[in-house]
Amino acid sequence: MTHLVKKTYLRSMKRRIKKVAVLGSGVMGSRIACHFANVGLEVILMDIVPKEANDKEKAKNLSIEDNAVRNRIVNDSLTFALKSNPSPIYKKTFAKKISTGNFTDDLDKIKDCDWIIEVIIENLDIKKSLFEKVEKARTPGTLITSNTSGIPIGLMTDGRSEDFKKHFCGTHFFNPPRYLPLLEIIPTKHTDPEVTAFFMDYGQRFLGKETVLCKDTPAFIANRVGVYSIMALFHIVEEMGLTVDEVDKLTGPIIGRPKSATFRTCDVVGLDTLVHVANGLKGAAPNDEKKETFVIPDYVSKMVENGWLGSKSNQGFYKKVKGEGGKSEILSLNLNTLEYEPKQKVKFATLEMTKPVDDLLKRLPMLIKGKDKAGEFYRKMFFSMLEYASNRIPEISDELYKIDDAVCAGFGYKLGPFATWDVLGVEATLNQMKAEGYSPAPWVEKMLASGSNSFYSSNAGSKTYYDIPSKSQVLIPGADQILDLDIIRESNTIWKNSGTTITNLGDGILNLEFHTKMNTIGGEVLAGINKAID
């Protein structure tokens, strides 16, 4: 859910985006360009000029003076992106919306662009040098943003004009941009509030994003909490002696997370990328009480040294090989020996016990109470995440719902930390955490003392959250403009059976939901349809 105030929403409609310049054509830049093309925008994608012609180009009598050579980097990057799987573009014909160029010859073309987004190497000096050139070419009033994930946004505009600073902020897309909905908006102290409001609205309405307003803190919101959780899990796995197969079984759909779970997700993201973010956090957040968690475990360091980075190197925590008869087989890494072994079936009593339970909200409390190794793992994993998230307020966000929104949209979780805590029971979980040596933020106890026993509630069909300064439940901004079926279902269900639910949306409108597997139509669904028509 994106949270917008009506007044802000209306003001932001004054500006229109028709053409975008994407500066940097790497993995993120090329895919961001594709997503802009997906929504019908004209895009110019640029990158640096190669130092010299390569052997293939020389064989064709091409030199560094030829456009084919000068635009080789950007053209190769775009071609690679368009061939990648999953595809970053809706239809191949949409790629015609993207033209290419280079910083040396074509930077003046940004004068016709409505939005300029920088997506180059994570080096502050190089970014500032590019922005100096951009300022000379851009039209005053043009929006300018950075997709950085690790450099403070406020440092990038040193030496830039007032107009540049006023129209500059961070716009952090998550990879792959077409598929992951999170877009973090990070204004600086100089950013015009209307620019911030515009991006919050534009990302939601035109780019299909979950826009989350962030403070300019290390790694912003989603990566700060999400990467911490992954790093904490790495250490828990080492401590408990769990296998790659076991962890991915425990941390996938069964707890409301993607099928890629933990280690497969790391392979997709790239272990080098994850290590880069973790090392960056360790240095950029020296006062973080959990900074030691960002220290890379030995088995991860050795994998990086070996070049086992995941999908990009064809092996990471998993490796695909040709088995007997030429059939492909997926091997998983033994974290102790660092040798690849056939995948093993995973069985835990706690998982067997919860197999019949389809409802995630009922399943999670059962999992965390497990008496076996799986239950112990869940307690360690969830308690560390809840502890860390609670202590990041107000550092990374003043409002707890922003942390949940960012983590869910950025990592594909069905429940963020605070929604998870509500499901587990706030007071009971808090007491258990303290008994096991965890130190959740003091404001959680104060919340319970104030009479609020949950982080979220509902009021007249709209979702509220616990506001720490006022010690009260407050309407989530924009919640009154959104129909939340989870809330409406609680009080406005007028009929249901095993396959359908009928709820009253007001204004003479009924909503009919299907609950059957794959939405198959059987007797229960037909009965629901007939009841709704009656």
Please report, for each region that a protein language model flagged, where it lies by residue:
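N-terminal glycine-rich phosphate-binding loop for ADP-containing cofactors
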Residues: 3-4, 10-534
